[in-house]
Regions:
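Alpha/beta catalytic cores of nucleotide-metabolism and tRNA/nucleoside-modifying enzymes
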Residues: 1-22, 205-238, 243-421
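Active-site entrance/lid segments in N-terminal catalytic domains of soluble metabolic enzymes
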Residues: 1-235, 263-268
Length: 421
């Protein structure tokens, strides 16, 4: 096989060119919310990654409230003995509610192809319901994955329920073209090896720079839409490698329909990752991931925005006891740092969360510790403002006009240094 000599680009290589002149008077005129896709209507174009350190059954609605679409990861409800039925029973309310839930290929086949949950008195999947499922694999290039999805889609039609399927990950734009022709996929996750907790590229050399991948898939999608030979034109999800607000905006500017965020969300205060609180006079560890929310974490949550902004507690419980309030203030003064543990789902730790008795595979993930700087609300508010600002510079009032319809500049190495301060 020949060496491909065409240069490929990552987010770091690009910046967005402003319009020559903008008719927008204020960035408040710009609307960064999704309105075209019924599955994501009125949300920001953002998913949480299906990682055990981000969303769980305890904080699920916090993400929703802040217009970020949460994904319930594969460890939630996982049975120590590997029982698929017990796991599905635990998360059934999320599935019935139409929430996004991550399943393994085996779980997906068990429920939506073999219909093994349709026991007497328990009709599941249910008639006229909509199920939103992410078949969560590392390797989205396997033909058997798409054969299974096609079977499940046909069975769903024959049984009068709707099945919305996300899968991936892929790292070749020609794979996207193949999926358009051969598979009924609704959403596809792009990128292998670009996530900060992923070491696949480092250890296997499988990698495709994500900015070029998004751009190439976008052009294929545009050419395939409406063609008779096409089975689907999946929404493009840029998954991995997002270091901050600018990378989210670049991904959408390149043509991604959505961005999926992992470790960046792990570092937010309410994420499912355990807290490590360092104080000047003491040291605390709190397992928020297990739903243990005790005084220490409540202290931080209630006073996160500072003592002068104590009314900003809409997602939290207020305690009126004056003595306890004083304790909280003292705790905040004593607090030095908050750290969250972030690890990829292919780490041995994450594998054990999904199935404690299974033999661990060679890890293609790593563990990092992230300093907490923001709440989910603070991050979301900032993202909205930065989105609106970028849209106003490029003279785009609506996200669908901004997506894939602005010009990007390839920068020199010295220009990149000037941007990445």
């Amino acid at each position: 096989m020949p060496i491909i000599e065409k240069t490929k680009y990552s987010y770091n290589d690009l910046t967005i060119e402003p319009a020559v002149i903008s008719s927008i008077k204020s960035r408040k005129e710009c609307d960064p919310y999704e309105h075209m896709d019924v599955n994501m209507r009125d949300y920001l174009p953002l998913f949480t990654a299906p990682m055990s350190t981000i969303a769980n059954e305890h904080n699920f609605n916090i993400w929703k409230k802040n217009k970020i679409m949460p994904m319930l990861p594969r460890n939630i409800g996982a049975d120590p003995n590997g029982s698929i039925e017990k796991r599905i029973s635990y998360i059934k309310d999320f599935l019935d509610n139409g929430d996004w839930v991550a399943l393994s290929l085996k779980e997906f086949e068990y429920v939506f192809v073999e219909h093994k949950m349709m026991s007497p008195g328990q009709i599941f999947p249910g008639y006229n319901r909509t199920y939103r499922v992410c078949v969560d694999l590392a390797n989205g290039h396997m033909e058997c994955l798409y054969d299974t999805i096609n079977k499940a889609k046909e069975i769903a039609r024959n049984n009068n329920y709707t099945l919305i399927v996300m899968t991936g990950n892929i790292a070749n734009s020609e794979t996207y073209r193949w999926i358009c022709k051969h598979a009924e996929v609704d959403y596809i996750r792009l990128s292998i090896g670009s996530g900060s907790n992923c070491i696949t590229a480092t250890q296997t050399s499988i990698y495709y720079p994500i900015a070029s991948l998004i751009d190439e898939c976008k052009h294929i999608k545009n050419r395939c839409e409406g063609k008779s030979y096409v089975k689907s034109t999946p929404y493009i999800i840029a998954d991995g490698g997002v270091r901050g607000y600018a990378d989210v905006i670049k991904a959408i500017a390149l043509g991604a329909d959505y961005v999926m965020i992992g470790s960046l969300f792990t570092g937010l205060l309410e994420s499912a990752a355990p807290l490590d609180i360092e104080c000047y006079n003491s040291h605390y560890k709190y397992g928020y991931a297990a739903g243990i929310i005790n005084d220490g974490i409540n202290n931080i949550l209630n006073l996160w925005d500072g003592l002068e902004d104590e009314d900003n507690n809409d997602t939290l419980v207020k305690i009126d006891n004056k003595e306890l309030e004083q304790k909280k203030k003292d705790f905040i003064k004593d607090m030095k740092d908050i750290v969250k543990e972030s690890y990829g789902m292919s780490t041995k730790k994450a594998q054990k969360l999904i199935n404690p008795n299974a033999k661990s595979k060679t890890s293609e993930g790593c563990t990092k510790y992230i300093h907490v700087k923001e709440t989910v609300k603070q991050w979301s508010d900032n993202m909205i403002d930065y989105f609106r600002s970028a849209m106003s510079y490029t003279d785009k009032k609506y996200i669908n006009d901004f997506r894939g319809k602005v010009d990007l500049i390839i920068n020199s190495s010295s220009a990149i240094l000037a941007v990445n301060k």
